[in-house]
A protein has these predicted regions:
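Gram-negative outer-membrane beta-barrel transporters
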Residues: 1-5, 13-16, 20-108
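Short, glycine/charged-rich beta-strand-loop motifs at protein surfaces that mediate ligand recognition
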Residues: 126-133, 140-144
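Surface-exposed loop/turn and secondary-structure junction residues enriched for glycine/proline
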Residues: 10-14, 29-31, 50, 75-77, ...
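Generic secondary-structure boundary/loop-capping signal
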Residues: 4-8, 23-25, 133, 157, ...
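Residue-level preference for alpha-helix termini and adjacent loops
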Residues: 6, 46, 73, 135, ...
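C-terminal beta-signal and adjacent terminal beta-strands/loops
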Residues: 101-120, 138, 144-178
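Solvent-exposed loop segments that connect transmembrane elements
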Residues: 10-24, 65, 112-126, 171-177
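Asparagine-centered polar/low-complexity signal
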Residues: 26-27, 60, 129, 159-165
Length: 178
């Protein structure tokens, strides 16, 4: 468990675009975080590898927001990493590796509705960081073979099952829908 004082975040409805006084759009508070990490590895034999899992939670508290807790962007409760490596052949000239990663998605604030007054659009947002993006996960495979005394042939396939992981989220608007 850890408490961090003097964290900085934006005020609600911050106006940061082309703002020469950005400091007026910032506020301070504190954060609480806790978690646990587990790790196991196998370092000998033809098959080696490791598994790592982390569970962590964080909550921010900002006085100007009523001291209500909210999850920060970096609150990603689950992180799992698995790495396996197998050395094949009598002389172990080729190695086959697999890496799997899973991470909870990031928190974000999204517009949930909008209305117009005299042609100007106004947005209504979800609670601060009230949505979590989809989880990120991928499987990568590789083969490395020694060729001669110094050469190596490496073949890698990234994101084997072609997961469309979310890197960032953009909202778009039209007159009827988001």
């Amino acid at each position: 468990y850890r408490k961090t004082n003097h964290i900085v975040d934006f005020v609600d409805n911050a106006n940061i675009f082309l703002n020469n006084q950005i400091e007026t759009q910032l506020t301070t508070g504190y954060s609480k975080a806790y978690g646990a990490e587990f790790y196991i590895s196998k370092n000998s034999g033809r098959l080696t590898g490791w598994i790592s899992y982390t569970f962590s939670r964080a909550r921010n508290y900002i006085a100007t927001l009523g001291d209500k807790e909210y999850p920060p962007v970096y609150d990603r409760p689950h992180s799992l990493k698995i790495f396996l490596n197998y050395e094949a052949g009598r002389k172990r000239r080729c190695a086959f590796a697999a890496t799997f990663s899973y991470n909870s998605g990031m928190n974000l604030t999204l517009p949930i509705a909008h209305y117009r007054v005299n042609g100007t659009a106004f947005y209504i947002y979800s609670t601060r960081n009230g949505y979590r993006a989809p989880a990120f996960h991928e499987l990568n495979l590789s083969m490395t073979c020694k060729t001669g005394k110094r050469g190596r042939l490496i073949l890698s396939v990234m994101n084997v099952y072609n997961r469309k992981n979310v890197f960032t989220i953009y909202t778009s608007r039209d007159d009827y829908d988001f």
